[in-house]
Amino acid sequence: KGNIVRTIMERYAGLRGYSERKLNVDCVEIDPYLRSILQYEFCGQRMRELSERIRQLDKKKEYDSEIRDYRKLNSVEAAEYRGLKREQEQLRRLDLHIVHDDFHTFQSRKHYDLIAMNPPFADGDAHLLKAIEIQRRSGGMIRCILNAETIRNPYTNRRRFLVKKLQELEAEIKYVEGAFSDSERRTDVEVALIIINIPSPKRESTIFDRLRRAAEVDEPTPNNVT
C-alpha cells in the first residue's frame, strides 16, 4: 500500500541536498487495487487533501479582532499541522509514475539507482533475476524481499541459478521471521531480505580506443626503421 515508496521518501528527505532535487520513482504494480492506492497517495489526490486541511488549520491562526491577537493551535492541532506540512513537502519533491503492470515484461532504458521490490512469493526468483539483469547494465542497488525457502531450498533450476548469481554478486541475505504477521494480508512465513550493490561497469571512450588502435597500426616496427 505504498509503504516502500513512503519509506524511500522519508530516507530521501534526510539526505544532504534534498531540497534541491526531486525523487523520481517508477512503479510497476500488477494489482489494480494497489495501483489505485498508489495513484491516490502519490499522484495528486492526497496532496489536494493535505492542502485543504492545512488551509483549514491556517485559518485558525488568523488574527482575531475580538482578542486583538493571533489565535494559536492547541497541542493536538499543532502536532497534526507539523505532520501535514512534512508530508506535503515530501510529496512536492516526489515525481512518481506508474509505468507498467507486469515486471516480467517491463522494459526501460533508464538507469535506476535503486530497485526496491516485494514480488509475489510464487515467482519471486524470476522477478529478482530480472532486476539483476536491469541493474547490471549500468550498476545500481537492489533491495528485494523473497520467501526464505526460495534461497534455502533451491530445488528448481531457476532457484539454483539465482543462488549462484547472488554468490557471484556477493549479495547480503538477512532472514526475518514474522515480517508480515501484522500486515493486512497476514502471513507468518519467514522472508529473506536480499541486499545487492552492483558496481557501474567500466566503460572506455570509443574515441580513445580508436586512437589507441590507430597508434598501434602506425607505430614503426624494427623491420621498417631506417
Spans of features found by a protein language model:
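Class I S-adenosyl-L-methionine-dependent methyltransferase catalytic core
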Residues: 1-226
